[in-house]
C-alpha cells in the first residue's frame, strides 16, 4: 500500500548513491523503484561512482586487508556534496561488501531484498561438464574469493583455483574466450540473477557456506537521519534482516572483513521464531577447517547479535582465531602500495 511522508530536506527527492558497475546500478535501480512505488510523493535519482575496489583489479582481494574497499568514496558524499557530486541520502551496497563496523557518522539503515545467497558454478560456454567433481585433475577454476577457494580446495583437491577479478560480465567474457585457461567460474548466484544472467548458472554449490550477507542489499545512511529511516522501515526484508544481523555479528566478533575465509549458512523458522546460524573458517590451503552452529529463538535485534557472538565463541574455542591471525600475517607480508 502506498505511503506518504513529510518532505525530506525541503524537497520530495531522495538522492541514491552506489557503485558504477552494471550490477551496482541495477541494485540501485531496484531500491529506487521500490521507494517510488511505496511512496508516490517521492522521486529518486541515482549517482554511480567508482570506488577503490572497482579501480584495482590486479590484486586478489585478501591482499588488500581493507574492510571498506567498496564504500569509502560514497560515504564522503553522505556527509556533503563535493564539487559536481551531490550530497547523498543513502547508499545501496551489496551487503557482503559492507563493513560490519561503520564510521561513527553512518549506520546500516536497513537490509533489503535477499536474493538466493548460494554460490554457483558457471561453466565455459559449450562445456559438457556440469559439476566440479566431473572436471579433470588440474582443471583451473576461477574465483575472486578466499572463502570460496579455501572451501573448494578442501573438497576438490584435484583442481586448481586461481584468482579472477573484474565485474561479472568481464569475468564471463574471460571465461568464454576459446584460449582461456579457466574451465569454469564460481560466482554468487544473486548477481547473475539480478543481471538477467541466471541462464549461465550450470549448477549450485548447495553444500558450500556462502559469504556473510551474500545476496542481500544493505542501505547505508547518515546516523540519526529519521526521515530516511522512516522510508527504509517500510521496505526492509524482515527475515533477511534477522539472518544477516546474526551473520554480520559473527564476522564483527571474529574481526573479519569481506576478504577472510568465513562462510555462513542461516535459516529462520518463522513459525518457531527460531534462527539457525552455521559458520565455517577454513585455512587458505584447505587443510584446516572449523565449523559449528547456534540455534536460538529471536525476539529482537539484540538476539540476532547474540547468535553471532555465541557462534564466534564456539569457533574461537576450536581455533578459528589462529587461522585468521595467520592470514593477517601473510597479508601484511604480501601488501604492496597500489596506485589508484
Swiss-Prot record:
<dbReference type="InterPro" id="IPR022418">
    <property type="entry name" value="Porphobilinogen_deaminase_C"/>
</dbReference>
<protein>
    <recommendedName>
        <fullName>Porphobilinogen deaminase</fullName>
        <ecNumber>2.5.1.61</ecNumber>
    </recommendedName>
</protein>
<dbReference type="InterPro" id="IPR036803">
    <property type="entry name" value="Porphobilinogen_deaminase_C_sf"/>
</dbReference>
<dbReference type="GO" id="GO:0004418">
    <property type="term" value="F:hydroxymethylbilane synthase activity"/>
</dbReference>
<dbReference type="InterPro" id="IPR000860">
    <property type="entry name" value="HemC"/>
</dbReference>
<comment type="pathway">
    <text>Porphyrin-containing compound metabolism; protoporphyrin-IX biosynthesis; coproporphyrinogen-III from 5-aminolevulinate: step 2/4.</text>
</comment>
<keyword id="KW-0808">Transferase</keyword>
<comment type="similarity">
    <text>Belongs to the HMBS family.</text>
</comment>
<keyword id="KW-0627">Porphyrin biosynthesis</keyword>
<dbReference type="Pfam" id="PF03900">
    <property type="entry name" value="Porphobil_deamC"/>
</dbReference>
<dbReference type="GO" id="GO:0006783">
    <property type="term" value="P:heme biosynthetic process"/>
</dbReference>
<comment type="function">
    <text>Tetrapolymerization of the monopyrrole PBG into the hydroxymethylbilane pre-uroporphyrinogen in several discrete steps.</text>
</comment>
<keyword id="KW-0350">Heme biosynthesis</keyword>
<dbReference type="InterPro" id="IPR022417">
    <property type="entry name" value="Porphobilin_deaminase_N"/>
</dbReference>
<dbReference type="InterPro" id="IPR022419">
    <property type="entry name" value="Porphobilin_deaminase_cofac_BS"/>
</dbReference>
<dbReference type="GO" id="GO:0005737">
    <property type="term" value="C:cytoplasm"/>
</dbReference>
<dbReference type="Pfam" id="PF01379">
    <property type="entry name" value="Porphobil_deam"/>
</dbReference>
<feature type="modified residue" description="S-(dipyrrolylmethanemethyl)cysteine">
    <location>
        <position position="258"/>
    </location>
</feature>
<dbReference type="GO" id="GO:0006782">
    <property type="term" value="P:protoporphyrinogen IX biosynthetic process"/>
</dbReference>
Amino acid at each position: 500500500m502506498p505511503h506518504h511522508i513529510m518532505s525530506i530536506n525541503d524537497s520530495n527527492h531522495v538522492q541514491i548513491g552506489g557503485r558504477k558497475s552494471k550490477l551496482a546500478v541495477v541494485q540501485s535501480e531496484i531500491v529506487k523503484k521500490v521507494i517510488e512505488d511505496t511512496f508516490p510523493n517521492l522521486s529518486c535519482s541515482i549517482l554511480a561512482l567508482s570506488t577503490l575496489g572497482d579501480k584495482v583489479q590486479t590484486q586478489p582481494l585478501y591482499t588488500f586487508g581493507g574492510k571498506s574497499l567498496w564504500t569509502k568514496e560514497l560515504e564522503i558524499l553522505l556527509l556533503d556534496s563535493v564539487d559536481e557530486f551531490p550530497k547523498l541520502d543513502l547508499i545501496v551496497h551489496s551487503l557482503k561488501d559492507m563493513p560490519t563496523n561503520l564510521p561513527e557518522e553512518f549506520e546500516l539503515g536497513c537490509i533489503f531484498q535477499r536474493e538466493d545467497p548460494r554460490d554457483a558454478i558457471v561453466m565455459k560456454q559449450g562445456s559438457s561438464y556440469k559439476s566440479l567433481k566431473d572436471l579433470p585433475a588440474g582443471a583451473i577454476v576461477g574465483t575472486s574469493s578466499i572463502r570460496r577457494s579455501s572451501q573448494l580446495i578442501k573438497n576438490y583437491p584435484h583442481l586448481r583455483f586461481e584468482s579472477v577479478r573484474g565485474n561479472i560480465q568481464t569475468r564471463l567474457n574471460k571465461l568464454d574466450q576459446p584460449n582461456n585457461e579457466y574451465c569454469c567460474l564460481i560466482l554468487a548466484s544473486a548477481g547473475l540473477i539480478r543481471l538477467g544472467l541466471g541462464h549461465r548458472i550450470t549448477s549450485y554449490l548447495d553444500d558450500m557456506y556462502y559469504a556473510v550477507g551474500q545476496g542481500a542489499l544493505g542501505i547505508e545512511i547518515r546516523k540519526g537521519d529519521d526521515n530516511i529511516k522512516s522510508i527504509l522501515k517500510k521496505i526492509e526484508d524482515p527475515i533477511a534482516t534477522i539472518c544477516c544481523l546474526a551473520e554480520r555479528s559473527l564476522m564483527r566478533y571474529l574481526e573479519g572483513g569481506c576478504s577472510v575465509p568465513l562462510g555462513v549458512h542461516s535459516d529462520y523458522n518463522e513459525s518457531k521464531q527460531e534462527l539457525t546460524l552455521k559458520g565455517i573458517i577454513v585455512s587458505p590451503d584447505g587443510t584446516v577447517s572449523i565449523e559449528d552452529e547456534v540455534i536460538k529463538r529471536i525476539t529482537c535485534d539484540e538476539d540476532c547479535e547474540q547468535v553471532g557472538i555465541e557462534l564466534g565463541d564456539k569457533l574461537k574455542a576450536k581455533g578459528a582465531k589462529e587461522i585468521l591471525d595467520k592470514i593477517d600475517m601473510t597479508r601484511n607480508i604480501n601488501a604492496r602500495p597500489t596506485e589508484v
